[in-house]
């Protein structure tokens, strides 16, 4: 029977089932329900909530609770959840009365399915092994404490969330848990962070039918999505209770929006970090690095970030808080100032000289510490309680920031390892902390940098868990820049993680340029030499030219890329968009992996000379060929000076910028708009100051562009800018490049005919609109 409420902004309704289980239901907002189930009278604490990873400041939701015999219901207007107090069966329907979830049931360990799934899990993952790497990385063997001897844990302490599936329903997300598919119905996904297997699992999936589930636990769990029973989705938890969120919307983008609302909106890197981030060889000293910087500028290959691998440290792989520079190879300061504080940037030494050339410096780090100390001290401080007196590991890095370092590469060593012998300060074991550590590491990095500098920095980490997207960027780890990395990008994007990348060009020689093509169209781009030499000036002439051309293309697209990043921070939409996210009604793309949409306008082919073009008109970005597709796969050989296929969607409006050697944070004075007229289309360009956190409180400018093609007339409109940010230009020049394939007869600016335009051999019309005021509505009419 209905028992009562837990008092908060939106109450947790408590229901006691006839089978002895206690259920809690909270309507977080209209479209999000949080559900807890336990065999006890009290619910266990969520560490994700305790440490500020999950949203708790929900606004009050209008809701109505009803009881009808054994049926308990809670309605929020758009959705209603019903629980049968006799059986525990839960169902959800929308306002129209359509059932979205027909049967969701919590199964205790007494149910035979727990033992069945445990056996399947243990058999499936029996051969999973992490190679030890000379003591640098590799899971501990459990010598010092109890370690699960089976993947499933103890079946007698397990439980299952069991959901009946609908015919034709497809599932996406799960983080980097599958490197065979992006559509996961029929798969089992392992939610446990493991080096070179599942670095960023996210216990979240969304259905093609407009709903999603986030399993709010940090313990090992498994998503059996129709693998054991094709009509049932079972979440196997290695504990006897559950805490999960159900989210609903009209589409998968709606579900991503709600999921990232719960677990944190995606972090936006500083604008310059969306340029080329390059890691030189780990044997290079400061003079080699400075020479690299000079050659990047001389060879006109744009680059913004250089980082140092472990060679910068006095002690190689120094995990301590006492680390120092290797002053024999690097001079960020005079060596005799090594023990003098506070630290500062010397403009005439290594870091300052890089800054003078427009480069930002990052440092490689390895970490192994107890992150619960910092978190518990933060809680104690808020409550006015004493501190632990123990060191906060991240604090020692402020000295390097003061010297001019602007970010850190967080190596998987050894946070990604299991630490079954650890006695965590908060009293938890590694069973609760291992997955959580992967969020707390970038969280504490971001919080330290924000507090110390007030600016966004470049930092990224190989591993993660739900919520990691809010605290920084990621790479696919030590898995190269090939197909494994491609699966990670697609699956992470479908899990609300926007800032993803990989070790671009870390592939076999014959795929290296194809990997560069891939990397150019990633949210952020890193090329990691490590033991190699990936500098563009070490390649042959043909490859140098391809390298340069791709980097120049990348930099020209920075307004488009950065706009997509800000959009992602507001909505949860990734920059790399798997095809089913953009074309959900096209069954041909359900599990498509050799291509994706880059933002809303580019279709990028990866490691293949075949590409599927959904229904519509597409333009070959390299040749200008226009293809009217009925939804079909085509084969094309890309030009000799390119390394992959690239198509532009009908109606596209793409903001670009003139050639630059580095980005900085200053907004572009001139925006080049590449326009592909087709019917009615539009595009909103988002901008901010490029480095502060003001975007989080709305300091974003939005410029809406609209194009209308009607017969022989194309009408293009630049609307007044909405919103503002520090440093926003009051006026701007727009260069229009209209790709209609026909020579205009007349062009009008407002009602005035203009003659200062050109029509080139590439069948593109170009005109310049100078000094356009941000408050003006500007309209160009082209007649053919």
State where each predicted segment sits.
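Aromatic- and carboxylate-enriched substrate-binding clefts and catalytic-loop regions
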Residues: 47-52, 302-551, 580-584, 592, ...
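Short, well-ordered beta-strand segments enriched in hydrophobic/aromatic residues
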Residues: 23-25, 35-37, 73-74, 78, ...
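Catalytic core of carbohydrate-active enzymes
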Residues: 447-457, 466-475, 494-498, 502, ...
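Catalytic and substrate-binding clefts that recognize carbohydrates or anionic sugar/phosphate headgroups
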Residues: 65-270, 280-281, 286, 293-298, ...
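Conserved, mostly hydrophobic/aromatic
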Residues: 25, 78, 204, 296, ...
């Amino acid at each position: 029977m209905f028992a009562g409420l837990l008092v908060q902004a939106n109450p947790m309704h408590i229901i006691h089932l006839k089978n002895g289980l206690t259920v809690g239901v909270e309507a977080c907002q209209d479209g999000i329900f949080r559900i807890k189930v336990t065999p006890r009278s009290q619910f266990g604490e969520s560490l994700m909530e305790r440490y500020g990873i999950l949203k708790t400041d929900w606004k009050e939701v209008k809701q109505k609770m009803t009881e009808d015999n054994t049926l308990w219901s809670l309605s929020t207007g758009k959705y209603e959840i019903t629980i049968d107090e006799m059986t525990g069966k839960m169902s959800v329907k929308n306002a129209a009365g359509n059932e979205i979830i027909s049967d969701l049931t919590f199964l205790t360990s007494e149910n035979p399915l727990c033992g069945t799934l445990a056996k399947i899990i243990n058999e499936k993952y029996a051969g999973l092994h992490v190679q030890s790497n000379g003591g640098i990385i590799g899971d501990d063997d459990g010598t010092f404490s109890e370690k699960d001897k089976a993947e499933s844990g103890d079946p007698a302490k397990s439980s299952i969330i069991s959901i009946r599936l609908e015919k034709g329903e497809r599932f996406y997300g799960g983080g980097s848990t599958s490197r065979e598919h992006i559509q996961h119905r029929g798969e089992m996904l392992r939610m446990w962070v493991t080096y070179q297997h599942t670095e960023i699992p996210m216990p979240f999936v969304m259905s093609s039918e407009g709903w999603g589930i986030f399993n709010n636990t940090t313990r090992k769990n498994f998503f059996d999505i129709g693998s054991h029973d094709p009509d049932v989705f079972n979440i196997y938890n290695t504990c006897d209770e559950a805490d999960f969120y159900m989210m609903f919307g009209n589409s998968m983008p709606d579900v991503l929006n709600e999921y990232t609302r719960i677990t944190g909106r995606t972090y936006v890197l500083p604008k310059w970090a969306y340029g080329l981030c390059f890691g030189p060889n780990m044997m290079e000293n400061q003079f080699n690095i400075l020479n690299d910087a000079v050659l990047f500028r001389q060879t006109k290959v744009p680059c913004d970030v250089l980082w140092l691998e472990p060679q910068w440290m006095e002690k190689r792989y120094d995990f301590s808080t006492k680390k120092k520079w290797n002053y024999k190879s690097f001079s960020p300061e005079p060596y005799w100032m090594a023990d003098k504080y506070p630290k500062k940037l010397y403009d005439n030494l290594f870091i300052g000289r890089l800054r003078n050339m427009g480069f930002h410096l990052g440092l490689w780090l390895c970490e192994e510490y107890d992150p619960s100390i910092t978190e518990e001290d933060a809680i104690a401080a808020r409550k006015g309680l004493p501190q632990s007196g123990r060191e906060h590991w991240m604090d020692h890095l402020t000295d390097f920031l003061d010297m001019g370092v602007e970010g850190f590469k967080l190596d998987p060593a050894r946070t990604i390892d299991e630490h079954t012998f650890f006695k965590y300060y908060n009293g938890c074991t590694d069973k609760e902390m291992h997955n959580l550590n992967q969020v707390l590491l970038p969280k504490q990095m971001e919080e330290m940098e924000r507090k110390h500098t007030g600016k966004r920095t470049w930092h990224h980490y190989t591993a993660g868990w739900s919520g990691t997207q809010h605290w920084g960027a990621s790479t696919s780890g030590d898995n190269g820049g090939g197909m494994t990395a491609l699966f990670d990008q697609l699956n992470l994007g479908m899990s609300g993680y926007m800032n993803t990348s990989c070790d671009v060009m870390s592939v076999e020689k014959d795929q290296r340029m194809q990997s560069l093509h891939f990397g150019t169209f990633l949210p952020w781009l890193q090329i990691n030499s490590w033991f190699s030499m990936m500098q563009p000036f070490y390649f042959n002439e043909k490859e140098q030219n391809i390298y340069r051309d791709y980097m120049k293309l990348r930099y020209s697209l920075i307004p488009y890329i950065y706009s997509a990043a800000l959009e992602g921070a507001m909505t949860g939409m990734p920059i790399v968009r798997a095809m089913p996210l953009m074309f959900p009604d096209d069954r041909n793309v359900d599990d498509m992996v050799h291509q994706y949409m880059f933002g809303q306008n580019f279709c990028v082919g990866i490691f293949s000379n075949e590409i599927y073009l959904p229904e519509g008109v597409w333009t070959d970005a390299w040749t200008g060929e226009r293809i009217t597709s009925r939804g079909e796969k085509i084969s094309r050989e890309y030009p000799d000076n390119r390394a992959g296929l690239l198509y532009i969607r009908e109606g596209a409006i793409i903001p670009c910028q003139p050639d630059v050697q580095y980005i900085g944070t200053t907004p572009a004075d001139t925006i080049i708009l590449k326009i592909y007229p087709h019917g009615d289309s539009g595009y909103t360009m988002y901008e901010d100051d490029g480095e502060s956190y003001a975007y989080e409180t709305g300091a974003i400018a939005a410029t809406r562009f609209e194009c209308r093609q009607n017969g022989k007339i194309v009408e293009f409109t630049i609307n007044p800018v909405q919103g503002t940010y520090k440093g926003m230009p009051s006026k701007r020049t727009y260069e229009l490049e209209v790709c209609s394939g026909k020579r205009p007869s007349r062009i009008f600016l407002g009602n005035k005919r203009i003659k200062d335009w050109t029509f080139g051999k590439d069948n593109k019309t170009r005109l310049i609109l100078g000094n356009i005021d941000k408050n003006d509505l500007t309209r160009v009419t082209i007649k053919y």
